[in-house]
């Protein structure tokens, strides 16, 4: 399967809410939209309309990754995932693997350390080693679910990305451009730094002179 950004966000939210707030699951379109647009625990932060979420839901429904549920006496349609661990799902994941996949769908590429820190509401990992073991299991499949990204400069750990969405291919194509942009930005910053410092020193000297003058005037008025 290859999910779009919006589809991945919808699936990630349904996986998350099923675990963290089971009393509110399945989710209505309004609740699902709010979950997709959360300002915390989401990367990137999105501002999807209900129409955009509905389009993603309809697409996932056609892919048989979501099902609709209507309560007795209620006209509100609610949605639940069929992504994994249901009688209709080919994909069966352990609680640990589900937590990792869910976090990667919601927050993009992350290191094992980040995954352990952020997973406490989804699954309690004993340590980073347990996270790394689970990552290896998800990678060492006939059809891998995750892959390791090249280690970035300044990072001690490599990041991992899920392979259910188009995110990994987009990252690969974006990395060279991003790297060159970073180098250019650093070069410009280094060239501009002396000029900025000189300007700042001049401004501070002027402020000190003005304060000194005001202080002298105040002393003179009091004497």
UniProtKB/Swiss-Prot annotation:
**Gene3D superfamilies xref list:** Winged helix-like DNA-binding domain superfamily/Winged helix DNA-binding domain
One Pfam annotation, family name?
DUF480
Q: Which domain of life is it from?
A: Bacteria
Q: Which family does it belong to?
A: Belongs to the UPF0502 family.
Q: What is this protein called?
A: UPF0502 protein Shew185_1758
Q: Which organism is it from?
A: Shewanella baltica (strain OS185)
């Amino acid at each position: 399967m290859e999910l779009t950004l919006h589809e991945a966000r919808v699936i990630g939210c349904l996986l998350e809410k099923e675990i963290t707030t089971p009393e509110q699951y399945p989710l209505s379109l309004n609740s699902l939209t709010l979950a997709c647009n959360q300002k915390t625990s989401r990367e990137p932060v999105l501002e999807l309309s209900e129409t955009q979420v509905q389009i993603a839901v309809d697409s996932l429904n056609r892919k048989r990754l979501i099902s609709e549920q209507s309560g007795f006496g209620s006209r509100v349609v609610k949605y639940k995932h069929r992504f994994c661990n249901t009688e209709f799902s080919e994909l069966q994941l352990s609680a640990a693997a589900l937590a990792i996949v869910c976090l990667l769908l919601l927050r993009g590429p992350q290191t094992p350390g980040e995954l352990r820190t952020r997973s406490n509401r989804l699954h309690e990992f004993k340590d980073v080693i347990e996270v790394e073991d689970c990552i290896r299991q998800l990678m060492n499949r006939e059809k891998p679910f995750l892959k390791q990204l090249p280690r970035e400069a300044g990072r001690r750990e490599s990041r991992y990305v899920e392979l259910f969405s188009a995110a990994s291919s987009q990252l690969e194509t974006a990395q060279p451009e991003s790297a060159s942009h970073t180098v250019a930005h650093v070069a410009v910053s280094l060239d501009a730094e002396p000029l900025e410092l000189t300007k700042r020193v001049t401004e501070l000297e002027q402020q000190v002179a003005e304060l000194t003058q005001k202080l002298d005037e105040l002393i003179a008025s009091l004497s």
